Amino acid sequence: MERPLKIGITCFPLIGGSGILATALGTELAARGHDVHFFSHAQPVRLDLSRPRIYFHQVEVGHATVFPCPDYTLPLAVKMAEVGQSQRLDIFHVHYAVPHATAAFLATEMIGAGAPKVVTTLHGTDTTLLGPNPQYRAAIEHALIHSDAVTTVSESLRRQTEETFQLRDEIRVIPNFFTLNPSTKSREEVRRELGISDREFLVVHMSNLRPTKRIDLLLRVVAAASRRPSIRLLILAGASFEPFQALVDELGLRENVIVREDAAVVEDFLPAADAGLYTSENESFGLSILETLFFGKPVVAFRIGGIPEVVGDAAYLHEFGDIAAMAASLDALVNSPDAARELGERGRARAEQYFAATNIVPQYEAVYRQVIAKCHRA
């Protein structure tokens, strides 16, 4: 029997695909008997510290007066080095190359012989937004080259990464996963709390509202739908929705839009929804889409990035920017509940078949053991 591992996971703590995936992965790894140590500047929103074998090490952002700006990379590297050495960690699994893989590289240099091996998972931003920027490109490339393994969450992102950076080793694709937790409220209870009647069609959108999520297009799709009077849009926002309030008023959607900010637990909202709507201009995977599929809700989205790999033929996909086509698909779901239900069930079946934790977590364990074994052979 293989021994349990000691794994350090570094991620951002906020609502967003990378942090949510990293937290879920660590939780699953701990349930499988591994010790998991999280590093971040705040406790990740979905991290349950009451579970056994899960530890959290908070990193204080540097505020030394000699620096013009607060520093995070160096305090993070020092904390990772301290814990990595004292706990004899086997792996640093970092989500995002900068600053996390850079901090991991520095930490391993501080530790020296016997340092943890570094596995870097790219979720998109390093490649699509920061990679083309000459201020970051060399640092990202350095961090990836000095990782013992690099993974991406989709084949689309793997191709983009290989085109953007000059890397020596193979990039492995390990998709995201989702573990369905039971809802604590019924569909009727949630809709009643939201002020939505059973006759209204509830569309859900979950994101951190970053510019790439194109919330402007999200609102315009709903505004363009002919069944707009019966559509309510629930936005589970990982950031302030205030910048978009003016557009809501401009489009006359004040009666259609409901916003819940910092909603970390989606299980209570998704059962009350009838469909999911996503309008990103760049999406390497689409974890929110996967969560929507797991609840058997039909999805309407743009055909970009890794989204087709997630949904297959179990969603309505359209070319980016085609608001009319997106609105027409939304109308079709409203007009045909049976077709909407059938599409949602196809999506659920696909999610359960390909993106369950039981399929994905062992792939990460295999990568960990491969890099450890490779080092020992060397």
Give the predicted meaning of each segment.
Residues 43-44, 178, 206, 210, ...:
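Glycosyltransferase donor-sugar binding loop
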Residues 158-178:
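Helix-loop-beta element that forms the nucleotide-linked donor phosphate-binding surface
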Residues 183-196:
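A short helix/loop element that forms part of the nucleotide-sugar donor recognition site in Leloir-type
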Residues 197-213, 219-222:
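Conserved donor-binding/catalytic core segment of Leloir-type glycosyltransferases
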Residues 245-263:
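Nucleotide-activated donor-binding/catalytic signature segment of Leloir-type glycosyltransferases, i.e.
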Residues 281:
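Aromatic "clamp/platform" in nucleotide-sugar-dependent glycosyltransferases that forms part
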Residues 298-301:
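Short hydrophobic beta-strand element within catalytic cores of glycosyltransferases
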Residues 316-323, 332-337:
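Conserved acidic donor-binding segment of nucleotide-sugar-dependent glycosyltransferases
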